[in-house]
Regions:
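All-alpha RGS (Regulator of G-protein Signaling) helical domain and cognate RGS-like helical scaffolds
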Residues: 1-239
Length: 239
């Protein structure tokens, strides 16, 4: 956490040379992701700030004429399981399914930045999450998008009251729902006991690995929303 805040301060300091700020932003991406993974109480803060640092680094890279990859939604590729409870994984699968459906509808109408590939990535992630959960599949598969279609370009984000591009709000709402699901997970908290058995330490390692994967996955959604024009200042991202 200390490294994350230090690099974030350098990143935001306009009196510093842009190269120093760019390098600090890159470091902040991983520092904040590690904060989310190793300190569950800071999962939301770490995930959102990691995505914010990604976005800042990308903007600085453009000014420095450095080629940097555009955000791509991860799909839990190569993952066998998550040490997160079934209810939380199920809730995340619903969030991905909703976003996938909305993106499919938008792509069919050539609205915003939506593509069928983005829709498929959401839906693939949704299917994998519900499979990992082992829970009953409660996904509706189709959802009411009338409000989104009534405001295809910009819409008021109900979470902040701010106007933002509609496709970006879809991605941001997906991320917020997933963060809430992880934070409510019965497996996401750690105790402060001084004595640890090997099994307990192994369990902690498993949770940290799971949270690390999830923070990166969710940050992808936030990063994409920011790239599409969702406000990146703190008041828009943090409660």
């Amino acid at each position: 956490y200390a490294d994350a805040t230090a690099n974030a301060d350098i990143m935001a300091d306009r009196s510093r040379h842009i190269i120093m700020r760019y390098l600090a932003a890159q470091e902040a991406v991983s520092d904040w992701a590690n904060t989310a993974a190793y300190c569950p109480a800071r999962f939301a803060d770490g995930t959102l700030r990691s995505a914010q640092a990604r976005h800042t680094a990308r903007l600085m890279a453009a000014r420095l004429t450095i080629n940097i990859a555009q955000p791509t939604l991860s799909r839990c590729d190569g993952i066998d399981s998550f040490d997160i409870d079934a209810d939380s994984l199920s809730a995340m699968s619903v969030a991905e399914d909703q976003s996938g459906f909305a993106m499919e509808v938008f792509a069919a109408r050539s609205i915003g930045h939506a593509t069928l590939d983005i829709s498929d990535r959401h839906k693939t992630t949704s299917q994998r999450l519900i499979s990992f959960s082992g829970a009953e599949d409660t996904r509706a598969k189709t959802y009411d998008v009338a409000q989104l279609l009534a405001h295809p370009d910009t819409i008021v984000d109900s979470a902040t009251g701010l106007f933002a591009p509609t496709d970006a709000v879809i991605e941001m709402n997906c991320a917020r729902s997933e963060i809430a699901a992880v934070e409510s997970s019965s497996n996401s908290t750690s105790d402060s006991a001084q004595s640890r058995t090997t099994a307990e330490n192994s369990s902690d390692d498993s949770r940290q690995q799971s949270l690390g994967i999830l923070t990166s996955m969710i940050a992808d959604r936030v990063d994409l929303a920011l790239t599409w024009g969702y406000p990146s200042f703190d008041e828009a991202l943090f409660e």
